[in-house]
Amino acid sequence: MLTRKQHELLMFIHERIKETGVSPSFDEMKEALDLASKSGIHRLITALEERGFLRRLPHRARALEVVRLPQQATAAAPPKGRAPFKPQLVEAGQAMPVAANDTRELPILGKIAAGTPIEAIQQERDRLPVPEAMLGAGEHFVLEIQGDSMINAGILDGDFVVIRRTDSANSGDIVVALVDGEEATLKRLRKKGASIALEAANPAYETRIFGPDRVAVQGRLVGLIRRYH
C-alpha cells in the first residue's frame, strides 16, 4: 500500500508523461508535492521503485517510466490544482449543434502562437458564434492558434481558442501570456517560486522561465472550436 505522498507523486508523474511525453523534472515534482527539498523526491521515487510502480531508465535525463498504477488510481484525483486541463471542444464542420439564440458572437482578435511567441494580441478582425454553454461570467474573446506546441493538450494549429479575460491564473492553467509587453503566446502557466514558467504540451518545445515582471496574463482558456474546410 502506498503512502499519500507516494500516491500523489506516482499520479503526477503518470499524468505529466501522458500529457507531454516526458517525465517531470525534480523541481516540478518538488513543487507539485509542496516538499522543501529534492531529497524527499528521491526517497519517494526509490520507494516507488522498490514497490514496482516506477522504473528509472538508465543513461537518460528525466527518464522515469510508470510500470503500473495502484488499483484505486483510476478513481483517485491528482494532487490539488495539478489536473491537466483539456478544453471543451466544439467541432464546427457543418453546423453547430446549438440553436442560434444559444450562441454568442465573440470577437476574433487575431492569431496567437502555440509555439514561439510571434505577436501581441491584435484588434478585432472578425466574429465567431460560440455556444453559451461554453461561457460563464465575464468578458470573452477568441484567438486563432498558430503552431503545434499545445497538441498534447488537444489544441491544434488552426483551432480557435475561447479565452476568458483575466489578469490572474492558477498554476496549471492554460493562459494567454504577454511576454515583455509585446509577444503573446498560449501556454500552460506554472508558478515556480518567484518565477513564472510557460510550459508547452509538446516535448519538442522547452519550458521557458521568466521573472514575474516579464509575463502578464491576458486571459484563461475555457474552450476550443475546430473548423473543417
UniProtKB/Swiss-Prot annotation:
It comes from the Bacteria. The record marks 114-115 as: Cleavage. The active site is at residues 149, 187. Keywords: Autocatalytic cleavage, DNA damage, DNA repair, DNA replication, DNA-binding, Hydrolase, Repressor, SOS response, Transcription, Transcription regulation. Gene3D superfamilies: Umud Fragment, subunit A (2.10.109.10), Winged helix-like DNA-binding domain superfamily/Winged helix DNA-binding domain (1.10.10.10). One of its GO terms (biological process) is DNA replication. Residues 26-46 bind DNA. It catalyses: Hydrolysis of Ala-|-Gly bond in repressor LexA. The keyword rRNA-binding does not apply. Pfam families: LexA_DNA_bind, Peptidase_S24. The keyword Iron does not apply. SUPFAM superfamilies: LexA/Signal peptidase (SSF51306), Winged helix' DNA-binding domain (SSF46785). Its EC number is 3.4.21.88. Belongs to the peptidase S24 family. This is LexA repressor. It comes from Phenylobacterium zucineum (strain HLK1).
